[in-house]
Amino acid sequence: MQETEMKKSEQRLTREVYEDGRPSLFYVLRIRKGEHFSRDRVCYSLLAFVLEGEVEMSTGIYVKEIACEGQMFVVHKGDNGYTKGLKDAVILLCSFDSSMALCNGLSLGNATEDYKEPTPEERQSQGLPRLEIKSMLMTELKLIQHEVESNLLGYRFMEFKRYIIVYMLRTLYNKEELFYMFRCVRSDDFDFRDKVLHFYTCDINAQELCAKMEMSSATFNRRFKRAFGMPCGEWLNSKRQVQVLMDLKTTDLSVKEIAGKYNLTPNYLTDFCKRFLGDVPVNLR
């Protein structure tokens, strides 16, 4: 049943790559109520606009977050993503990179001293950062959705459309709002972040990751917290929560096989699920 649902979902995702290999800047995901859609690793940072319906999202350090019609949020490059339709939903996805300036003095690639980075505890308690889509922006997004699904947008036209979206974000939202939603992307250490995501695997621990980065523990820990906003151990644990949930929801792997994937015993995996995901593995499927 899950494989059938996944295939249906895949068929309703407009193309992500052009024939010449360039990534599509916009694509549309249609997902039905009860249907699952997942990505093990997102290749590009994404702006996600929920145009219709309601979904349950797990991505990065956030687990089982609800995103409703009229809301937008960010999925970060290198993160995994799991989406479940709570209602029939339409999501417009727009890829971007760290050079995309949002307003004067505030770009995704440069931190600013004007705003305080949230603590790890604040990140967890506040949940996935999201903003309401204002009516003027929603009108443009629905037009783009229609153009994408009608195959009317070439690459250059998509670049122009993305520029319009960026301009509208800069015009309709203030710096505080943009910082709130893009705060994790606005790391001033993109090279370090990308290198961490390159070496990251589902079974790695903080000590092994530090060794691959060829840094002293003190330097690695300092730079990791600056780039990701929390200690490495907390980040790895949060990532594991999302990945275990994806494995339970979207694969036919046994509990023993899932535990082996993360170098855990089945009993430890059961305790992990009860503690962090709220139930035993069999009930989470």
Question: Model-found features: residue ranges?
Answer:
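Basic/polar phosphate-binding segments, predominantly the helix-turn-helix DNA-binding elements
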Residues: 207-239, 251, 257-284
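Recognition helices and adjacent regulatory flanks at domain boundaries
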Residues: 166-186, 193-198, 208-211, 219, ...
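Amphipathic alpha-helical segments enriched in hydrophobic/aromatic residues interleaved with Lys/Arg
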Residues: 109-168, 194
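N-terminal regulatory/effector-sensing and dimerization cores
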Residues: 18-121, 154-155
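N-terminal positioning helix adjacent to the helix-turn-helix/winged-helix DNA-binding module
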Residues: 136, 161, 184-192, 228, ...
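A short, N-terminal "cap"/entry segment at the start of jelly-roll beta-barrel domains
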Residues: 1-20, 150
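Basic, amphipathic alpha-helical hairpins
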Residues: 142-157, 168-178, 191-205, 224, ...
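Glycine-centered loop/turn positions within well-structured domains
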Residues: 55, 81, 230, 242, ...
